[in-house]
Amino acid sequence: MDICVRPVWAEIDLDIIANNMKEIRNLVGEKEIIAVVKANAYGHGALDIASTLLENGASRLAVAIITEADELRDAGITAPIMILGYTPINFAENLINNEIEQTVYDVEYAKELSDFALKLGKKAKIHIAIDTGMGRIGFLPNEEGLNKVLEICSLPGVEVVGLFTHFSTSDEKDKTYTYEQFSKLTNFNKALEDNGIHIPLKHASNSGAIMDLPETYLDGVRCGIISYGYYPSEEVKKENLKLKPALTLKTNVAFVKELDEDMYVSYGRTYKTEKKSKIATLPIGYADGYSRLLSGKAKVIIKGQFANVIGRVCMDQCMVDVTHIEDVKIGDEVILLGEENGLKFDANDMAEIMGTINYEILCMISHRVPRIYKKNNEIVKVRNYI
């Protein structure tokens, strides 16, 4: 690679992002697509993929926190942006002036937003969250919750853009609980309509429901992990969407040395060579998001072959056994997460080792890691965060 970046990088294929989004569009038809780009677009880089998502099917974006929304607005993104989580009221002027749509689940908060908006001569755009069974944020779908939402809808400085809930088990085979959640939301919405309140954008379907439950699409859907090419679980109907991971994590060999039998590698002396061995050091560690839990368990791809990670992953480096691979040298390219010529070690494989989910693996890739964007197999953008 001729560009000047640190020898650890994540390659993101924008053509794959585009194709994944087109697949989602084909599945959901004319429903509005809210592309979730929180956590730096699940590690893919929100600033640099937002336009690709919007050009290929999404009409809205969703983030978790105000600074994520600000970053997109500052970059010139004009599409509607929804904040899925909590924003302190001292950011109210920012929300209103930048037309950022805030999730609301508290009457007093809504009143404060309304007051700020009236002072500015504008409307605060909001989505009202209903807790149908996640046990997280949101009004409960009971009479008390209904009265609170009706009060919010009457506030003069507020424009209620959306009503939504979040499914907790839509990616599981048994959909019983998801149907219960969906029924609670639709019944709550009917009660609102019976009181003369008609909210334009009702949304509930997350990635699991998008794949398996078209009857839950309502007015719009929220796609997260599937935009980036990963399925939310092994229990969804994968045949409904043809997805491909867009991100490959790479590095270059930093050093190669031979060790005699009975020599130790890395902290704690957890690995000892059983024979004369060739060991390659890679300049990536847990500070980059390459977890210490991968120590002695992960694989990498070098010269078309797997090599095992040995010893403990360090903060900035790790070691792999390349005894069986000929002519490994400093500068050779290494795939830590991805696929090449039929060999695959991806976020699902890492997640299984670490006892977590593919979402977390992607989000762990830190800001120390440059992102390199490709279209038509050519580099079109490099993002160095630090």
From Swiss-Prot:
This is Alanine racemase. Keywords: Isomerase, Pyridoxal phosphate. SMART domains: Ala_racemase_C. Pfam families: Ala_racemase_C, Ala_racemase_N. PANTHER family: ALANINE RACEMASE, ALANINE RACEMASE, CATABOLIC-RELATED. Gene3D superfamilies: Alanine racemase (3.20.20.10), Lyase, Ornithine Decarboxylase, Chain A, domain 1 (2.40.37.10). Its EC number is 5.1.1.1. It catalyses: L-alanine = D-alanine. The gene is alr. The lineage of its organism: Bacteria, Bacillati, Bacillota, Clostridia, Eubacteriales. GO terms for molecular function: alanine racemase activity; pyridoxal phosphate binding. PROSITE patterns: ALANINE_RACEMASE. GO terms for cellular component: cytosol. Catalyzes the interconversion of L-alanine and D-alanine. May also act on other amino acids. Substrate binds at R136, M315. The keyword Isomerase applies. It comes from the Bacteria. The keyword NADP does not apply. Pathway: Amino-acid biosynthesis; D-alanine biosynthesis; D-alanine from L-alanine: step 1/1. Its cofactor is pyridoxal 5'-phosphate. InterPro entries: Ala_racemase, Ala_racemase/Decarboxylase_C, Ala_racemase_C, Ala_racemase_N, Ala_racemase_pyridoxalP-BS, PLP-binding_barrel. GO terms for biological process: D-alanine biosynthetic process; peptidoglycan biosynthetic process. The active site is at K38, Y267.
